[in-house]
Amino acid sequence: MRAVPTRERGEFDLLAMLCILPSLLYVLCMFVYPFLYGLYLSLRPTKIAGFSLANYLTFFSDPYQYGTIWITFSLAVPNTIVVLLLSLFLAYGMRRGFFMERTVTTILILPISLGVILLSEGILGFYGSQGWLNQALIALGLVSEPFILTHNYIGVILALFMQQFPFCFLMLLGYISGIDPSLERSARMLGATPWTVFRRVMLPLMAPGLAIAFALVFVMSFAVFPSAIMLGQPSGSTRTISIAAYQQAFEQYDMSYASAIAVVMGLCQFAALIVIILLRRRMAPR
């Protein structure tokens, strides 16, 4: 029987390159070029000839502008942690399947199909000061005044959670379901408690998937825009960095300054991803 020739590592593979080429071109056209063009615009201030860092100096010298970074982090980080923990809890509990699993999963992922605008409108209708929840509580005599759950920090967190929980839940459910169940059974046969199995066996195996889910949810949370406008205070406590960029671009018509803010936003996301990747490497099982 003739042996099948194997390809040495590092040897050029034309077929593989042809398969990668469409994706590479897409990334270059849709991500790399816009970023480089935005970087170019940010270095060409409207009122200064030639290249300059004036836009970045203006941004970091104005507390009203650079404060949007911390506001955005204060929304993205807590939401990401809550989404990840709840998704992990449910996905870990559903990894073996149970009665009506498909029905429960469908209900949990339903918000994905609604879209950001429709979901925000639904939150306003249910959690708003004149929404169903407050009207029901007042009618039952449980409260005398409505809870203020929208047009503030809480409203934006509610929207972010409902948008991103289904995505994170599906990702973790698929990842956890792919872990060999015999590893868990073997640990239990050796006398390990359920908590020990989770902490010593399952958690190290889930760590790479948790890191990826955390990174993706964080990036989406950091880019919050419609929810911060519709359910928050876009000129106050929920004025995120994306809102600052929008205001400069479409209210002040200063595309150069808006590009600088967008670049700062991208660099913040990139720095966070680097930290997450480094932590993922440390947590990965050896």
Residue ranges of predicted features:
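Short membrane-interfacial helix/loop motifs at transmembrane-helix boundaries
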Residues: 2-4, 25-63, 130-131, 231-238, ...
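Glycine/proline-centered hinge or cleavage motifs at structural transition points of membrane proteins
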Residues: 190-191, 204
